[in-house]
Amino acid sequence: MSLLLLQLLVLSCLGDTEPQPDSQQRKRRPLQHLFYLDRNLLESQSFHELVGENPVGVKETQEEPSFFIAFPQTAGESQKQGEKKMSRFILPNAELYAHQDLRTWAAPKEISPVENFSPSYYSNKRDVEPPYRKDAKKFWDHFMLRKNSASEEVVLPIKTNEMHQETCRTLPFSQSVAHESCEKVIVQNNLCFGKCSSFHVPGPDDRLYTFCSKCLPTKFSMKHLDLNCTSSVPVVKKVMIVEECNCETQKIEDPLLGSRQSDFLGNLPEHN
């Protein structure tokens, strides 16, 4: 409030004074400084009512916003150009108010809503893939396993990764076909190699049901080889040429294994 009264006093004194010679203007030069005014104070209604919209002798500059107000010089053009160099000078006693008002002028940076619709914003969203999509196939296989097991009224605690560890592939090799008193023949063939799953289910009446998935040839052809022999009897060999292999599930019912299990259970001691 004291700063406001001081500024009003200076404005009223400068508005009433008449132009004086150069010697008197030099005496008033210390009063012709730049005063730091708060923007909220300049725009307040009470300040305009006390001072007026446009005080006498004050020029409004709308070229660029500034925190400083310069009072006009009544001297010549040479002195005005010299004072323009000091138009950005801040009084030492006004620096205290400048530091106190920095917090009011420093506003947080607001993000425009247009930036949220930029392509880079959505590209980053698309790059971050939800983690559950990576295991979508595993969850689906687990669901199908429980669904198929429920139809048989049996829920098997089998992990899905154990079911997908089956490997069965063809490995090329050179197969030699030989016979007594005949020339050996080399044939390019494939063998089945891999690891397939299997499980064993005990059944009623000591019967055991074994479900084995074996790595077997699924695509093959039979080839007849005529061997060159010294005997008068022709020798023909029949060879399976394997092209593809896969895990094939087979159900085996072995009563011999059932009898072995009953013998094993009969030898166990009874526990009360």
UniProtKB/Swiss-Prot annotation:
A Pfam family matched in the record: DAN
Signal sequence region: 1-19
Subcellular location: Secreted
Gene Ontology biological process terms in this record: anterior/posterior axis specification; bone mineralization; cell migration involved in gastrulation; cellular response to cadmium ion; determination of dorsal identity; determination of heart left/right asymmetry; determination of left/right asymmetry in lateral mesoderm; growth plate cartilage chondrocyte proliferation
Predominant location category: secreted
Domain CTCK: 168-253
A cellular-component GO term for this protein: extracellular space
Disulfide bonds: 168-215, 182-229, 192-245, 196-247
Lineage top rank: taxon: Eukaryota
InterPro entries for this protein: Cerberus, Cys_knot_C, Cystine-knot_cytokine, DAN
GO-annotated molecular function: BMP binding; cytokine activity; morphogen activity; protein homodimerization activity
Chain positions carrying an annotated carbohydrate: 228
Induction per the UniProt record: By SHH signaling both in the head and in the trunk. On the left side in the head was also controlled by NODAL.
Chain ranges passing through the membrane: none
Keyword terms: Cytokine, Disulfide bond, Glycoprotein, Secreted, Signal
Role of this protein: Cytokine that acts as a regulator of the activity of Nodal/BMP pathways during the establishment of bilateral asymmetry in the head and trunk of the embryo.
Family of the protein in this entry: Belongs to the DAN family.
Protein name according to UniProt: Cerberus
Organism the protein comes from: Gallus gallus
Gene transcribed to yield this protein: CER1
